[in-house]
Amino acid sequence: MPVDPAKLAALQKKSGAQSGGKGTPRRPGKKVAGRNISEDEKKLSATLKKFNAQEITGISEVNMFKEDGTVLHFPKVHVEGSVASNTFAISGPSQQKDIAELIPDILPQMGQDALLQLQQAAVQFSKLQEQAKKTAGGPDAAKEAGDDEIPNLVENFEDNVE
């Protein structure tokens, strides 16, 4: 079987370091990019122990309001916190919901200040929705801009060229 010396030289350059044989150091294996969830939880619990975080009982659910009008809802929540270091960890299954879905459940739990903030957020959210409809380029937006009508050609422009 004939061996092409040019191909052999190219393969030797590609191989770089020797991967085996007597007296050669072994290469370390590549680590997998995907991480295990249990490893992350172990690191988190170790960090919380450093902060001397204690489990906070009596919290049945947590709602985090986002700027885009959605809510991150934790129905079954586990809360740990350290008041001294101002650190709190919220864990558990989460769901992303719209504000309108949660308002009947949230209103009895809120205070006066929170209700005012919620009203402001609702007004701001409705303004954002109106702006999105105008910029979406729907049929109503085109009629308002006057771009819907195309003018008819009255003359033949080729006659004017001659």
Curated annotation (Swiss-Prot):
PROSITE patterns from the UniProt entry: NAC_AB (PS51151)
Main location (coarse class): cytoplasm
Domain NAC-A/B residues, every copy: 38-103
Compositionally biased spans, kind Basic residues: 24-33
One GO-annotated biological process of the protein: protein transport
Highest taxon of source: Eukaryota
Acidic residues composition-biased segments: 146-162
Chain intervals for the UniProt region annotation (Disordered): 1-39, 130-162
Gene Ontology CC terms: cytosol; nascent polypeptide-associated complex; nucleus
PANTHER family noted in UniProt: TRANSCRIPTION FACTOR BTF3 FAMILY MEMBER
Protein role: Component of the nascent polypeptide-associated complex (NAC), a dynamic component of the ribosomal exit tunnel, protecting the emerging polypeptides from interaction with other cytoplasmic proteins to ensure appropriate nascent protein targeting. The NAC complex also promotes mitochondrial protein import by enhancing productive ribosome interactions with the outer mitochondrial membrane and blocks the inappropriate interaction of ribosomes translating non-secretory nascent polypeptides with translocation sites in the membrane of the endoplasmic reticulum.
Similarity comment: Belongs to the NAC-beta family.
Protein name (record): Nascent polypeptide-associated complex subunit beta
Gene source species: Yarrowia lipolytica (strain CLIB 122 / E 150) (Yeast)
